[in-house]
A protein has these predicted regions:
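Gly/Ser-rich, low-complexity
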Residues: 1-72, 87-97, 107-177, 216-221, ...
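Hydrophobic alpha-helical transmembrane segments
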Residues: 66-79, 196
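Transmembrane alpha-helical segments of multi-pass small-molecule transport proteins
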Residues: 74-81, 171-173, 200-204
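Membrane-embedded alpha-helices of multi-pass transport/permease systems
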Residues: 75, 120, 124-127, 184-187, ...
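Membrane-water interface regions at transmembrane-helix termini and the short interhelical loops
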Residues: 81-94, 182-186, 214-215
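Sec-exported extracytoplasmic/periplasmic mature domains
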Residues: 83-86, 105-108, 199
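Extended serine/threonine-enriched, polar tracts that run as long, contiguous segments within proteins
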Residues: 182-189, 193-196, 200-239
Length: 288
């Protein structure tokens, strides 16, 4: 009878061991792929990230948004002229130099909305250069290997069925968690670029407000927001570099599950840090 029970126990152990190894095998591949590609993705200019999408955004901005910006600029220029006249006693004390100042301000505003995309790309050229230079300094291996799985497999057959079943539940939860985290990393990195495209699509409207002192804060805040989006890539690289250092501190021992849980915790920390990069960049540059 004991032989039969032992055979059943060994059979259950083999099933649980195979299931655990299946859950843990290639566990970190999705995360490795997403984290490994972060430096390349955040270092790519908006025009190169997805050229067809960028061409569509540029066409919409020039053909749909730019005429609206022209109307706003016309209103602002007329408002400035009327305000200038009324402030000088209906031209009784009007100086000719003031009209030249108005013409100069209006011409600069027209030039800015006409060359909006050149200005926007110059902003991202500066920030992407910072990201490119920092990626050469910030280094570290972020690839997570299947830690001690062969050692874990040999030790599992020595465990009882109860603890082995608990280990199976842990491995199942870890597998789901790591896949969710890989999706979260993908969403954060690609979501930043989509946010850039959305900001660029409406660029002519805030750029049209620079000619008026009362409304220029719209354009100033917009420009700060663009710099924040650009430097967010730099903060993302810093998060990945910290993640790489933390991974190197994970102790590889016979207790592979604890090591894996440590890596899961660090990956969750990475996702949380990536979420915070946007708010940190905006708070530093005073954008809202």
């Amino acid at each position: 009878m004991e032989t039969v029970l032992k055979a059943i126990s060994d059979w259950i152990k083999s099933l649980l061991t195979a299931a655990i190894m299946s859950n843990l095998s290639g566990l970190f591949e999705d995360v490795n792929t997403q984290v490994g590609g972060i430096a390349q993705q955040v270092g790519t200019k908006p025009s190169s990230f997805e050229p067809r999408v960028f061409a569509m955004i540029e066409a919409l901005s020039r053909n749909v948004v730019l005429p609206i910006a022209g109307v706003i600029l016309t209103f602002i220029a007329c408002y400035e002229l009327i305000q200038m006249i009324t402030q000088h006693n209906n031209m009784a004390q009007f100086e000719p130099a003031l009209i030249l100042k108005w013409i100069f301000k209006t011409a600069i505003s027209v030039w800015m909305i006409s060359n909006t995309f050149d200005i926007i790309m110059a902003v991202f050229d500066v920030t992407q250069q910072v990201v490119a230079n920092s990626s050469g300094i910030i280094s570290g291996n972020t690839r997570v290997n299947d830690i001690g799985l062969s050692m874990l497999q040999s030790s599992m057959m020595q465990m009882d069925v109860g603890p082995l079943f608990g280990l199976f539940l842990q491995s199942f939860f870890i597998g789901i968690t790591m896949r969710i985290l890989s999706i979260v990393i993908f969403v954060i990195v690609y979501g930043r670029m989509i946010e850039i495209y959305m900001a660029v699509s409406l660029a002519p409207i805030p750029m049209a407000t620079w000619g008026n002192h009362e409304q220029s804060h719209v354009g100033q805040n917009y420009l700060r927001s663009l710099f924040a989006l650009g430097f967010q890539g730099f903060l993302i690289l810093i998060c990945v570099a910290i993640y790489a250092v933390l991974l190197q501190n994970v102790a590889i021992s016979g207790d592979a599950i604890n090591s894996i849980w440590s890596i899961v915790g660090y990956t969750i920390l990475l996702c949380f840090s990536l979420f915070k990069t946007s708010s940190v960049a905006k708070s530093i540059l005073g954008a809202h």
